[in-house]
From Swiss-Prot:
Annotated family: Belongs to the phosphoglycerate kinase family.
InterPro entries to which the protein is assigned, alphabetical: Phosphoglycerate_kinase (IPR001576), Phosphoglycerate_kinase_CS (IPR015911), Phosphoglycerate_kinase_N (IPR015824), Phosphoglycerate_kinase_sf (IPR036043)
Gene from which the chain derives: pgk
Binding locations of substrate: 22-24, 37, 60-63, 118, 151
Protein name: Phosphoglycerate kinase
Root EC class: transferase
Chain residues that bind ATP: 201, 322, 352-355
Recorded GO CC terms: cytosol
Compartment annotation: Cytoplasm
Pathway: Carbohydrate degradation; glycolysis; pyruvate from D-glyceraldehyde 3-phosphate: step 2/5
Molecular function GO terms recorded: ADP binding; ATP binding; phosphoglycerate kinase activity
Amino acid sequence: MINVPSIESCDFHNKNVLLRVDFNVPIKNGRICDATRILRALPTIQYLANAGAKVIVISHFGRPKAKDSNLSLKNVVETLSRLLSKEVKFIDDCIGERVQRAINAMDGGDIILLENLRFYKEEEQNDSNFAKQLASLADIYINDAFSCSHRAHASISRITEFLPSYAGFCLQDELKYLEQAISFDAKPITAIVGGAKISTKIKMLIKLAEKVDYLILGGAIANNFLLFNKVNIGKSFFQNGVDDLLHDIVETANKNNCKIVVPEDVLVAVNSDYSTGVLRKIESILDGDIILDIGPQTLSTISGIIASSKTLLWNGPIGVFEHSAFANGTVEVMRVVSDLTHEGKLTSVIGGGDSLSAINTAGLADKDFTYISTGGGAFLSWLSGDEMPGLRSTLD
């Protein structure tokens, strides 16, 4: 197990604690569509407040080019206060004298939320001076943002040079469950990988092909494999110039007795009509077809594989679930995984690739799976074995 410096070993009474969370939540028409990342941060925030800390919460939000009211964390503070049943004060900056004055006025147990870190370009540049200014606000730094820990940013990586650093409860949970899943002790193990671009997942696919018993492919990634196997995919989305990568994955899978599973039948959109799915066998796809979901035979095959497995890792949707006509594959496989998890027959770890949205579409929740990772790119980096600057700096 990774040795994580736990916040439970520290005295926080009357200490200024800088807590890095990930409040990069989806917002539509001013309303938060999915508060999962906020909910995951609550245990750490509550623990620190109850321990008498002055809790200074920092996060990024979106990808602003400059200060933008639509990407202000002011949009989050009301929800955070409601979920904590406690007033959270918002400060519309994250460094400088106004922020320092607000912190000086805090009592133990108070919570403030600072403005979007990415309003300063120095955040993404991992700038030492910006990190030093953030660090000057506090006595202790806590990273509770696994989903950002693959990034070498000032508030994730550089800041740990200036403050004693600890891991929050959300980060600890992520590490525990992901490490448990990729230890590959409970076999057979199955991985489902979907999504659009295979090039962003090549290292993960090769690593999985070395370790898992079944590698189930969905989305445009499956289209690339079908094309590689000389199957006509019509007008379906695929990525050019990746045949060498596909060859490496297939070769790795063959060497390690990993079975790669691609669709046998699919639902397609005809003439770009996304309102209705037409069922096709793989060998019967027409030139104008766009593959957008798996068919019933493929669903049956995948369900059988999962039922025979002990561990499941899932990254990315199987179909274009945003269109109701093509959501069935993702939704039904989610339900199979959920049922087996509830029966105690399967350890299921899901993350990245719009997984939270897909889970909501299926009418399911956190409790229906062993663990749902908040990480997108971080989940990919972890499964790929990449170095994660935020973890290295926090855990060193």
